[in-house]
UniProtKB/Swiss-Prot annotation:
Binding partners and assembly: Homohexamer.
Chloroplast listed as a keyword: no
Family under the similarity heading: Belongs to the UMP kinase family.
Cellular component GO terms held in the UniProt record: cytoplasm
Molecular function terms, GO-annotated: ATP binding; UMP kinase activity
The entry's keywords: Allosteric enzyme, ATP-binding, Cytoplasm, Kinase, Nucleotide-binding, Pyrimidine biosynthesis, Transferase
One Gene Ontology biological process: UDP biosynthetic process
InterPro entries: AceGlu_kinase-like_sf (IPR036393), Asp/Glu/Uridylate_kinase (IPR001048), Uridylate_kinase (IPR011817), Uridylate_kinase_bac (IPR015963)
Binding site for UMP: 52, 72, 133-140
Organism: Halalkalibacterium halodurans (strain ATCC BAA-125 / DSM 18197 / FERM 7344 / JCM 9153 / C-125) (Bacillus halodurans)
Lineage: Bacteria, Bacillati, Bacillota, Bacilli, Bacillales
Name of this protein: Uridylate kinase
Length: 239
């Protein structure tokens, strides 16, 4: 039986690119859709927030002289492309889903309306939140934290493609990097650990929303996280 009834799954854009590193890998997105279907079948209400880093990064554009707000809006549009691709993969598996965007584009998706999103979840539809918060200067991690608070999700599942949890140093650089099984948001902020940005961490901490950081690369990990099995790192309001 699932430990959580309502979850927000945070997917990085890079996770959708697979080994090619750019764009959308159809096999990878199909695998993720299959894993989402597994937890929907456990009667879990699933909302998804997708990043856009596989197509465009606002910070990268800004660093090269582009207006930051313009670069961020481009990033939001990239998340819409990813969200539509994920919706298509879910529908191919007969999983009902809805894309809701923070920036209105009614021809392709619903506008974000909190009560409607909750109603979709109650009807066991997967709701994919796209276009970030709709505001520049906010990351999709912050979107995940904000939407989790709004829909009263019990946990955020942060699926990573390069690490399998939270470490005290970059494991790809430091062979002695130590993985935490659990850590508090306060310690994450104090130590400047690269889990999510400080705005997102603070929002989760203030609203007491736990976070499970794990690897998306191993199939079945989303289900393990939902079942409450020991996986990755759990970040809580207090340890």
């Amino acid at each position: 039986m699932a430990k959580y009834k309502r979850v927000v799954l945070k997917l990085s854009g890079e996770a959708l690119a697979g080994e090619q590193g750019y764009g959308i890998d159809p096999e990878v997105i199909q695998s993720i859709a299959s894993q989402i279907k597994e937890i929907v079948e456990l009667d879990v209400e699933v909302a998804v927030v997708v990043g856009g880093g596989n197509i465009w990064r606002g910070m990268a554009g800004s660093a090269k002289g582009m207006d930051r707000a313009t670069a961020d809006y481009m990033g939001m549009l990239a998340t819409v492309m990813n969200s539509l691709a994920l919706q298509d993969s879910l529908e191919n598996l007969d999983v009902q889903s809805r894309v809701q965007t923070s920036i209105e584009m009614r021809q392709v998706a619903e506008p974000y309306i909190r009560r409607r999103a909750i109603r979709h979840l109650e009807k066991k539809r997967v709701v994919i939140f796209a276009a970030g918060t709709g505001n520049p200067y906010f990351s999709t991690d912050t979107t995940a934290a904000l939407r989790a608070a709004e829909i009263e999700a019990e946990v955020i599942l942060m699926a990573k493609n390069k690490v399998d949890g939270v470490y005290n140093a970059e494991p790809s650089v430091d062979v002695n990097a130590k993985k935490y099984t659990s850590i508090s948001y306060l310690d994450v902020l104090k130590e400047g650990l690269a889990v999510m940005d400080s705005t997102a961490s603070s929002l989760c901490m203030d609203n007491n929303i736990p976070l499970i950081v794990f690897s998306i690369m191993e199939e079945g990990n989303i289900k393990k996280a939902v079942l409450g099995e020991e996986i990755g790192t759990v970040v809580r309001g207090s340890n």
